[in-house]
């Protein structure tokens, strides 16, 4: 099973990716992990990427696609792989198609923006232990206070509503078009096109996992 998981920040992709990878015995591949591994291993592409990153630049799609092609030939990808956060843009998707990277399926986890804002902006964290709460879905016994230590909880900057809105805007402008790209490609009936499936990402984790696995069956 070779698949891409798409969905807005906070849609629950990370949680579902873990279940899917366990179920199919495939690795979860993120560009960040790939870059770090290639730099550490000192591969030609890794050294090229390091040069760009050290100068504060963005690693080009050519380098990323090269890393992807190297990564998916490794033994742990024999049964497939799950791309996490890649491709992010239409040019990356085009480059992947041109490079002949084969995909079986694109799965979109669809969650309305309002639900994502509620989900993310309600998170509260106890910094020292990493314990997380949610003001609505998993509240502490006493509002704003850690159950175990009685110490105050914080809202991370990443979870503040303004930040969440900004991340959603970036998603809508850059990554959301990929959903249409893969849906349109699948609709052409091209044999090389991955299937496109969309599931609702609201409800309990178990309900969403059941939907995800049914979509992949």
Curated annotation (Swiss-Prot):
Record-listed AMP binding positions: 31, 36, 57-59, 85-88, 92, 156, 167
Gene name of this polypeptide: adk
HAMAP family: Adenylate_kinase_Adk
Ranges where the record places region NMP: 30-59
Quaternary structure note: Monomer.
UniProt subcellular location: Cytoplasm
Job description of the protein: Catalyzes the reversible transfer of the terminal phosphate group between ATP and AMP. Plays an important role in cellular energy homeostasis and in adenine nucleotide metabolism.
Identification of the protein by name: Adenylate kinase
Major enzyme class: transferase
Domain notes per entry: Consists of three domains, a large central CORE domain and two small peripheral domains, NMPbind and LID, which undergo movements during catalysis. The LID domain closes over the site of phosphoryl transfer upon ATP binding. Assembling and dissambling the active center during each catalytic cycle provides an effective means to prevent ATP hydrolysis.
Catalytic activity reported: AMP + ATP = 2 ADP
Pathway stated in the Swiss-Prot or TrEMBL entry: Purine metabolism; AMP biosynthesis via salvage pathway; AMP from ADP: step 1/1
PROSITE patterns documented for this protein: ADENYLATE_KINASE
Chain intervals for the UniProt region annotation (LID): 122-159
Positions of ATP binding: 10-15, 123, 132-133, 203
Any single Gene Ontology cellular-component annotation: cytoplasm
UniProt cross-references to Pfam families, sorted A to Z: ADK (PF00406), ADK_lid (PF05191)
Domain of life: Bacteria
Record-level GO BP terms: AMP salvage
Disulphide-bridged cysteine pairs: none
GO MF term (any one): adenylate kinase activity
E.C. numbers: 2.7.4.3
Keywords of the record: ATP-binding, Cytoplasm, Kinase, Nucleotide biosynthesis, Nucleotide-binding, Transferase
Homology family: Belongs to the adenylate kinase family.
InterPro entries noted in UniProt: Adenyl_kin_sub (IPR006259), Adenylat/UMP-CMP_kin (IPR000850), Adenylat_kinase_CS (IPR033690), Adenylate_kinase_lid-dom (IPR007862), P-loop_NTPase (IPR027417)
């Amino acid at each position: 099973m070779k698949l891409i998981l798409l969905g807005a920040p906070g849609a629950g992709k990370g949680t579902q990716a873990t279940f899917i990878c366990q179920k199919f015995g495939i690795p979860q591949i993120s560009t960040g992990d790939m870059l770090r591994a290639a730099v550490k291993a000192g591969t030609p592409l890794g050294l090229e990427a390091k040069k760009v990153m050290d100068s504060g630049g963005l690693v080009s799609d050519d380098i990323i696609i090269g890393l992807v092609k190297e990564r998916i030939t490794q033994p742990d990808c024999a049964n497939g792989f799950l791309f996490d956060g890649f491709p992010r843009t239409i040019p990356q998707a085009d480059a992947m198609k041109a490079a002949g990277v084969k995909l079986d399926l694109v799965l979109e986890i669809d969650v309305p923006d309002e639900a994502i804002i509620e989900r993310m902006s309600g998170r509260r964290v106890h910094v020292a232990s990493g314990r997380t709460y949610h003001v609505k879905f998993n509240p502490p016994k006493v509002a704003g206070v850690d159950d175990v230590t009685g110490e105050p909880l914080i809202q991370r900057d990443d979870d503040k509503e303004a930040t969440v809105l900004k991340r959603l805007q970036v998603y809508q402008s850059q990554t959301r078009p990929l959903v249409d790209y893969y849906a349109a490609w699948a609709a052409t009936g091209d044999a090389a096109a991955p299937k496109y499936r969309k599931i609702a990402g609201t409800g309990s984790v178990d309900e969403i996992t059941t939907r995800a696995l049914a979509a992949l069956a």
